[in-house]
Regions:
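Membrane-interface helix-loop-helix junctions at transmembrane boundaries of multi-pass membrane enzymes
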Residues: 88-97, 138-153, 300-308
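Hydrophobic cores of alpha-helical transmembrane segments in multi-pass inner/ER membrane proteins
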Residues: 76-84, 124-137, 192-211, 290-297
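Membrane-interfacial catalytic/cofactor-binding modules of polytopic membrane enzymes
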Residues: 243-290, 296
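Interfacial helix-loop-helix junctions of multi-pass membrane proteins
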Residues: 34-43, 110-124, 166-187, 248-258
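Individual transmembrane alpha-helix segments
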Residues: 59-80, 274-291
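Extracytosolic (periplasmic/ER-lumenal) interhelical loops and adjacent juxtamembrane/interface segments
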Residues: 35-68, 254-277
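Membrane-interfacial, low-structure loops and terminal tails that flank and connect transmembrane helices
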Residues: 1-10, 138-148, 210-228
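N-terminal signal-anchor transmembrane alpha helix
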Residues: 12-39, 236-248
């Protein structure tokens, strides 16, 4: 992730990247509200909402407001992330070309009487594929002043937001079709990918910051080696904790073990009853929480020691 000598600081782009991070955090927060209020199926169709882009009275009914608002916000964020990627690559032509191809392919499929769901998935991935291909083909005629790392991460974030749109749509259509197990897996996957998307965008914003590009963050490799390794371990542990937590949340098993810190009503550390719900809860609220806490504290102490 090192900044290359050709990297240049652009204040407007750096500010925009930070704004996209904040917007992504806001969208994840809204998505969490959708789950908390069980509003995900308050709008049972997709990509439209009750057959419309702007259903009548959607603001007046709270669950519908949450779900439809989440969709509108997600669509806006998809556009923001796409613009960020094109800006990092310093080439707006792929954006225009991809838009034209996506519209043309969707229109062609519509003449064959494809369903709105098929049309939306086709539009998303024809746009993504064309955008990716155009970026690669035109990269020599429009060289970026930014490092390979930030270009790669911005492109990964673009693909991530396309994947999120697909997962969100499939989650609704699968549940509408009563494929409940598939819908549950998609809900968990959708929530976990959202956090990964946020991390990607935070990395992009960091790599575009003045401090990173100026190199004021740099330390010798010998000092960073142990910190880097422990940081990776902590990231993996936190993400596993996230996956288990999302699974518990979407299974509705947040109170599978209703006592804390004891996992046993009789006062023991281990749960008295063992099933998928209690075991997941114990792994998340006890083992995972302790492991992540120790790793993060160790990482902070190591960073402070190496920074002396």
């Amino acid at each position: 992730l090192n900044a290359t000598p050709s990297s240049q600081f652009h204040s407007a782009l750096a500010f925009y990247a930070k704004a996209v991070v904040l917007a992504t955090f806001a969208l994840i927060f809204i998505g969490g509200l959708v789950t908390s209020y069980q509003a995900g199926m308050s709008v049972p169709d997709w990509p439209l909402s009750f057959g419309s882009l702007n259903p009548e009275g959607w603001w007046g009914e709270f669950p519908v407001r949450l779900e439809h608002g989440h969709r509108l916000f997600a669509a806006a964020l998809g556009l923001l992330v796409t613009i960020l990627c094109a800006w990092v690559w310093r080439n707006g032509w792929p954006l225009l070309i991809a838009l034209l191809i996506a519209v043309a392919s969707t229109f062609a499929a519509k003449t064959l009487h494809a369903s709105p769901v098929v049309l939306m998935h086709l539009g998303i991935w024809s746009f993504a594929g064309t955008f990716a291909l155009a970026l690669l083909v035109m990269r020599r005629s429009h060289p970026s002043v930014h490092s390979v790392a930030v270009r790669f991460l911005s492109f990964a974030a673009f693909l991530g937001v396309c994947l999120q749109a697909t997962l969100g749509g499939l989650r609704v259509t699968m549940e509408t079709a009563h494929h409940l197990k598939a819908a549950l897996l998609l809900r968990v996957f959708h929530g976990c990918v959202a956090q990964a998307e946020l991390c990607l965008l935070v990395l992009v914003a960091a790599l575009l910051s003045r401090g990173w590009i100026s190199g004021s963050w740099k330390h010798s490799g010998s000092k960073l080696g142990a910190v880097r390794n422990l940081a990776w371990v902590a990231v993996v542990a936190v993400y596993f904790q996230l996956i288990i937590g999302a699974t518990l949340r979407h299974l509705g098993a947040g109170l599978a073990i209703p006592t804390f810190p004891e996992a046993n009503p009789d006062g023991g550390f281990l749960p008295k009853v063992h099933n998928i719900f209690t075991d997941l809860h114990f792994a998340h609220s006890r083992l995972g929480a302790i492991t992540v806490t120790l790793l993060v504290i160790s990482l902070v102490l190591l960073v402070l020691r190496r920074a002396r």
